[in-house]
Amino acid sequence: MKQKYWNINLEEMMEAGIHFGHQAAKWNPKMKPYIFTERRGIHILNVTKTARLLSEACDFVANAASKGKQFLIVGTKYQAADLVASAALKARCHYVNQKWLGGMLTNWSTIEKRLRKFEDLQTKKNMGALDELPKKEAANLERQLAQLQKYLGGIRYMTNLPDIVIIVDQQKELTAIRECINLNIPTICLVDTDCDPDLTDISIPANDDARASIRWVLDKLTSAIQEGRCNSTKI
């Protein structure tokens, strides 16, 4: 797929607060190439560089989507959880937005078993089978189902390991990143000024705390995924 313009507007980026980094004292020196200046003790990101890297990320996901690749979006911090879910549903991606369970990728066979249990319980509930059980037993199974829905609901239909993982907060999701590295799964990650860009395959320097910033970046990536799927070759 050719490189294209993804309607990445610098003024919109500034309005979303994408350029605001963390306190300068908390920075990671590896982020120096992406920092424009320091203002009142806060690092300011270079939005021109962010725009270029985001455009490259959009090209990458659009191309992957056109080939039928599957995506997982990860963001479990409270201000990102609902944004991750809505972005994933919009682009028909899998997602994790509550808690990353250790081994979710590296111990996939165990997760598959839990997903099968999830489906089994959901089917029984839908058929009314739980209503026929003693109240205590039914209540216990309802609690199990609620827990499975909370933590695995976003990957309920994920039948294999994802081809690409998009991560909202590197610091929060280090376990997920390490699992991707171990399995050679490409990652795209928002990296704030306290992050290590070397840990991810495609870094997008951006404010990873502000909801407006997270929403804006996810919107661009998921729009690119949608376009890639529309352009996929039908066999």
Curated annotation (Swiss-Prot):
Please name every pair of cysteines joined by a disulfide bond in this record. none
Give GO BP annotations, semicolon-separated: translation
Q: Which cellular components does GO assign to this protein?
A: chloroplast; mitochondrial small ribosomal subunit
Which InterPro entries does the entry mention?
Ribosomal_uS2 (IPR001865), Ribosomal_uS2_bac/mit/plastid (IPR005706), Ribosomal_uS2_CS (IPR018130), Ribosomal_uS2_flav_dom_sf (IPR023591)
As one GO molecular function, the record gives: structural constituent of ribosome
The UniProt entry, under PROSITE patterns, shows: RIBOSOMAL_S2_2
Q: Which family does it belong to?
A: Belongs to the universal ribosomal protein uS2 family.
Name of the protein this chain belongs to = Small ribosomal subunit protein uS2c
Q: Which gene encodes it?
A: rps2
